[in-house]
Amino acid sequence: MSAPDAHPGPVPTADWAPAATPAGELRLVPVRPERDLAMISRWMNDPVVAAFWELAGDEDVTARHLAPQLGGGSHSTPCLGVLSGTPMSYWELYRADLDRLARHYPARPHDMGVHLLIGEGRHRGRGTGTTLLRAVTDLVLDHLPLCTRVVAEPDVRNVPSVSAFLSAGYRFSTEIELPEKRAALMIRDRAHRTRP
């Protein structure tokens, strides 16, 4: 995979150095549909992913999901997680305080949010999600000094996801009712980081 590309979203991932993790070197690479659409669509059609993302279908379904994030003025940046040179996860880093999510919890200015899916089944169930969540959250907090916390809202039925967030240093705040799911509001505070 070549060097990261410029992107339209609010998160400056293009100049973020890769993160060293126990699973390998992780780099966030902004999504480019011409390069990434087929792979992301394939991941969205994996039954485990489709059960919670609800974006199964042809590539047009995935393209329609990505389009608003790739347009100017978006508060969300879609990225591939490239682990030791292999694209293996999909991320959405977003300003939670500007998102519809802010209507469902006491948002603070500059709250960031994270969505994650592990693309290939061989990477699931081995603690990789926890490792990647910890690394990406640290990247966000390292590069966005006004952000005091990172939030997530996995479906409460997605026990492996909730567990990964907890193991990555997030705390369970409350359950919230969103239009598409009942979610576990997970929060990782800057003040509770395990490293400087």
What is each PLM-predicted segment?
Residues 42-56:
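Helix-loop element at the rim of GNAT/NAT acetyltransferase active sites that forms part
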Residues 110, 178-196:
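C-terminal "cap" of GNAT-fold acetyltransferases
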